[in-house]
Amino acid sequence: GEQNVLTSDPVVYFNQSSGSTGKQKLIPVTKRVRKVRSRVTQQSLGFMTDAAIKHGLEIGKMLLTTSIQIRDRTSGGIAYGTSSVGDLRNMDFLYRQVFVHPYDALKPADSTARNYVCLLFALGNPQMRVIGANFPILALQLADYLERYAEDLIQDIENGTIASWLKLEPEVRQTLEKQWNKLPHRAA
């Protein structure tokens, strides 16, 4: 986190490399980098929206189950983690409206709890159209969650509950429960 070594701009986050070429590295991210990435994302969304409209497809909401948990902080107090975590944590209110679930559904540290609540909100929303994932295997994992927890998901949709056995942080559970309603017609 030492200033003016790799960039003259203040570092706001470090992307952590995968380590596929050796030791994991921390790559500095600045406000300027985030601004450029945001523009690229906006352009990508524009192309995707345009293509969907041209093909007569409805534009809807996206299911994404990626964690927004940072890995840790440097000795200088700067957060670091995967680039997707950094991007998701930096999203403004407008971007967050793309999700079929509340942004807080990405907060659980426990992956089963996070995937479950994201799927729960997705199953309750008829506007769900897209599954976003960093890797194709995640789609198969979501299918496994659907199969494994089908009865609990249906019960929660019908009753407006969130399974008590999920390892959710109390404040996250409270926030999500306030945003969740029973939808018996979706459970039928």
Feature locations, PLM:
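Active-site phosphate/ATP/adenylate-binding loop shared across adenylate-forming ligases
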Residues: 1-188
